């Protein structure tokens, strides 16, 4: 994770040494954008975006209950990279919303309608493009 030292989240993570990566979805798009723009110094983003704190299993900081995947992390190293600091971390727990699991326990990412952010734009994900190894399979 990369943060500028001016960011509120930078100081929270540096103080606790922990953070949670919450997978974001089309349903959470507005909250995702809002939380990326508005500082937690000024606003309770949980309340404003009607998000539910979820107790983490291994870290002291909460996850977002509405997120289909929560990845709990502990900081192992901080590297200064010019204007940003890179927080390297170890994943210590993962929680998955059971509504996206099939009967065999496989998580179906595509059902959660994940989004990605690149260069100021949000993108929808989820369309299957190919299975692992497709490039070397023999044509029938």
Task: Briefly describe each language-model feature range.
Residues 1-140:
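Basic, polyanion-binding surface patches
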